Amino acid sequence: LNYDKCYSFELGDKKDENGTFIGRKRGERCPHCGCELIDILVIDGKDERFSFLGLDGIITASCCPNCVTFATDGISNRFTLDGKNEILEYEGMEENYYRDEEIESLVNNRFVVSEKERHVFYGAYGDDVNTIGGFASWVQDWEYRECPECGKKMKYLAQIHWDTIEDCAEGTLYIEICPECKIVTMFHQQT
């Protein structure tokens, strides 16, 4: 349920939206709360570093940053390898707690992917490391969701600690994948 390779995100001079990155506005609003929808993670599977994923294309994981923190079932997407996706139905909130400035801060982060591979447990060492692959730093208990399409357990794909991209935020966003069905699911944990 885990990948045997791991890469981290590091602070760079500026984010490069031509490859793998965290946070981009979609230009759409959440149908539940009205918050700006974001592509929280874009992975370029054509990048040799991510060949271990076995997906030769671009994977985009999108969510409402407001609703995903409250959605018990998380938010799932069906993706295509050309970087497009469809956000599947989810249970959202009525009230939006995100201000526009917070969305700007989130999408204007400077994270870039590490050039060198990290130890497979690198992401499990602390609560301030954003990773792709390897093992997660579970805030609560480990949690491998079932694919909403086929019902099999999904593989852990990535983690993003909210406070690394948004001041004073709490908790961690976990992203899991079913490569066969081309589904990603995002969910939140915090103490």
Question: Model-found features: residue ranges?
Answer:
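Preference for intrinsically disordered or flexible, low-complexity segments
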Residues: 1-191
